[in-house]
Design a protein with these regions (language model features):
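Active-site-proximal beta-alpha loop/turn segments in soluble metabolic enzymes
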Residues: 207-211, 242-243, 277-283, 313-324, ...
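Structured alpha-helical segments in the cores of large, soluble enzyme domains
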Residues: 113, 144, 218-236, 250-267, ...
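Conserved small/polar residues in nucleotide/adenosyl-binding loops
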Residues: 1-5
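C-terminal structured domains
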Residues: 277, 289, 318-327, 333-343, ...
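Conserved catalytic alpha/beta cores of large enzymes that bind or transform nucleotide phosphates
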Residues: 9-107, 310-318, 341, 346-348, ...
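Aromatic- and carboxylate-enriched substrate-binding clefts and catalytic-loop regions
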Residues: 155, 304-319, 327, 349-371
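Structured, charged N-terminal subsegments at the starts of enzyme catalytic cores
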Residues: 69-275, 279
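Acidic, glycine-enriched catalytic cores built around paired aspartates
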Residues: 60-76, 80, 157, 162-164, ...
Length: 687
């Protein structure tokens, strides 16, 4: 049992304990059903013959606020709830022993403690049903119902921890298994053969993974993770949420995880729900077909009981194809996936893997939800909240409730009054622009020889990977290049230099093609009448307002070799072209300056004012960052400045254990990190 889960459970127990105390005080009525009265009588009789001593003396020693003496049968709800209070107290004591190392985990067989939320819900529901049956509806629907809802939603651990792993790691594990038992290489099988094998194993009962399996450390890690999942599901039910498969591409990716869960000791009736994460453009397009293939497997269709979670990735799709192409692929993918779910009678919950920045799908919560395709939410929504915006949206009590209000209101509004969908002409326009923008984006990023060295030199992307920033490695694999780079440092690097290239690259060509084809009026109509397109354009406009070509040019001048300067000038020209045509479509006189209702004079929005004020502080940080990037690269090239020696006595004393060059490197790195954090704070959404 992990410390994180134990601490979360202690917090939950304390919350529920206080609520139970209040309910014991308020539920003083005597009217109840005969079965409920019999239950209360049995509890009192058991307490009277308790071999461990006087129950009421024990309650007195625990310093309960009230009702520690014997409760009469005429107060049956208090009798039941007092027993629940005792169990919550016992649970808290047991969890404290787990945290201190005196015991390994809670014992699910111990009836004196509460391990699963069902154990707490059962007596509460018994109270609720009894009150309803005898006509005390006002009491039943008061604090008691509030507590039932809290327990139902938050369980005994408050927050469930999702598990996430790449699909290739599961394939490697199964490859080791099939080779060990003499079936050949799972990695070399086609999708048909993989699916047939997995379904056959899932329908059968034979053990698949041998105890003496010889495998690599990577495979052992995957199998150990599944064994830990099985263990936690037994001793800490409700602690884990969904198993997310990143870089999912085919139906067998999901079946593989279900099989590995079972074969590593998981209870077939309590396996984690498995959510494929479709991230790249081609995977988003093919995702609905793979869901159809998955739901067509009778065993799996029965296993999921009409519910399936699907995660869609905004980050890697944007990095793979550009923001415009990714946005349209996500829109169409959600529509088609929902239709597949309806076809097979499966309620689909879409899990939106959004980042904090527009390049990774970020944006205002309410607008983002309302711009989703009609009939794709239906009262169910999951969304990631990035660490960089957690404090902003949930850091204070008022902000937290305001954010939850926005999510709830938007989800209900979208469900009860879905936004209008696009007409066929608008779909055709988007399909054409998707192809054009994607082709241009990929041409520049993946096919232009100058791009990779320019990116490495003109941004702090390379340095980000070596600094202790972020929760994940900057690259998925050790090989160099943009392809291996994760979406977060990809966006982060361009945001630091104020270029924001991943958001707008390829759009100018797509919009210009429509303009040349006489479709400017159509684009303006789309902006005025289609929530998806309007939100997309407004977010792009916001990012363009945050961009500063002069700052980007300064990074280039100071950090990039002269042979690449012409390429940088082309990119800045593309940024200007994007800005011009976006303003032409939105009919705004300037960025973040909508037309005034009177006289056509622009009025700056609050955001524009904030950006103008922040720029006074961010630009000096950019200058300092450039200087420290130069210094750090000199160190890495083996040419540190030899005359650098600290002159302050306190610095010499505190950092005296370092060699001079190590100290120099530490100071430069720390300064660089400070500039990164400062620019990130000014930009608000960075990675």
């Amino acid at each position: 049992m992990c410390i994180r889960d134990s601490l979360a459970r202690v917090t939950a127990v304390n919350l529920y304990f206080n609520e139970i105390q209040k309910l014991i005080f308020s539920l003083s009525m005597w009217r109840c059903t005969p079965s409920f009265s019999a239950r209360a009588r049995a509890i009192l009789e058991e307490a009277d013959k308790n071999p461990d001593g006087d129950v009421y003396e024990m309650r007195k020693r625990r310093n309960y606020s009230d009702f520690w003496r014997s409760i009469p049968l005429e107060e049956p709800y208090r009798v039941i709830l007092a027993e629940v209070r005792d169990k919550l107290y016992n649970t808290r004591e047991a969890l404290q022993e787990v945290i201190s190392g005196k015991r390994h985990a809670l014992d699910p067989a111990d009836e004196s403690v509460i391990c699963a939320k069902e154990q707490l819900l059962e007596p509460l529901m018994a109270c609720y049903d009894s009150l309803k049956e005898v006509g005390d509806m006002t009491v039943a629907d008061g604090f008691l119902l509030d507590l039932i809802r809290q327990v139902h939603n938050f369980g005994m651990g408050l927050v469930k921890l999702d598990i996430r792993q790449e699909s290739d790691r599961h394939a490697d594990a199964l490859d080791a298994v099939t080779k060990h038992i003499g079936l050949g290489s799972y990695a070399e099988w086609d999708e048909e053969k993989r699916t047939a094998f997995l379904v056959g194993e899932l329908e059968g009962k034979r053990p698949l993974i041998a105890n003496d399996l010889e495998c690599s450390a990577e495979v052992r890690e995957v199998l150990d993770t599944f064994r830990m999942i099985a263990h936690l599901q037994k001793v800490c039910p409700g602690s884990l949420g969904t198993y997310v498969i990143s870089m999912a591409t085919v139906a067998s990716d999901v079946l593989a995880v279900v099989l590995l869960q079972r074969e590593c000791g998981g209870d077939p009736a309590a396996l984690l729900n498995v959510a494929p994460l479709f991230e790249r453009l081609d995977d988003l397009r093919d995702g609905p077909a793979q869901l159809k293939r998955l739901f067509s497997v009778p065993w799996y269709h029965t296993h999921i009981k009409g519910k399936q979670e699907v995660m869609i990735g905004y980050s890697d799709s944007g990095k793979d194809a550009g923001r415009l192409a990714a946005a349209w692929a996500l829109y169409e993918g959600q529509e088609m996936a929902t239709h597949v779910g309806d076809e097979f009678g499966v309620k689909l919950t879409l899990f939106h893997g959004r980042g904090g920045t527009v390049g990774r799908g970020g944006g205002p919560s309410h607008l983002a939800i309302m711009s989703q395709p009609p009939s794709t939410i239906n009262g169910r929504l999951r969304v990631t909240v990035q660490g960089e915006v957690i404090e902003q949206n949930f850091g204070e009590h008022e902000n937290c409730f305001h954010t939850m209000d926005l999510y709830t209101a938007a989800t209900l509004e979208h469900t009860l009054k879905p936004p209008d969908g696009p007409v066929d002409e608008w779909r055709d326009v988007m399909a054409t622009m998707e192809k054009t923008s994607c082709a241009r984006y990929r041409e520049v990023v993946f096919q232009t020889p100058e791009f990779n060295p320019y990116f490495i030199q003109a941004t702090p992307g390379q340095e980000l990977g070596s600094l202790n920033i972020g929760s994940r490695p900057s690259k998925r694999k050790s090989n160099a290049g943009v392809v291996a780079l994760r979406a977060i440092p990809w966006i982060f690097a361009w945001t630091q230099s104020r270029f924001h290239l991943p958001v707008w690259l390829g759009m100018a060509e797509a919009f210009q093609q429509m303009k040349d084809d006489g479709k400017m009026g159509t684009l303006r109509a789309m902006y005025q009448g289609w929530p998806f397109f309007k939100v997309t354009m407004d977010l792009i406009e916001m990012v363009l307002a945050k961009a500063d070509p002069a700052v980007a040019a300064y990074y280039e001048k100071e950090l990039v070799e002269p042979s690449l300067h012409a390429f940088g000038a082309q990119l800045r020209q593309a940024l200007k072209a994007t800005t011009d045509i976006v303003l032409e479509i939105t009919e705004h006189p300037d960025l973040l300056t909508p037309q005034s209702d009177t006289g056509g004079q622009g009025t700056y929005t609050t955001l524009a004012d904030k950006l103008a004020m922040r720029s006074l502080y961010i630009t000096p940080l950019n200058v300092v960052q450039v200087e420290n990037l130069k210094l750090l690269r000199e160190i890495e090239d083996g040419n540190p400045r030899p005359d650098w020696v600290p002159t302050w006595d306190w610095a010499k004393e505190m950092l005296g254990r370092y060699e001079s060059n190590d100290l120099y490197h530490a100071v430069v790195s720390d300064t660089l990190i400070i500039t990164m954090k400062g620019i990130a704070a000014g930009m608000q959404n960075t990675g």
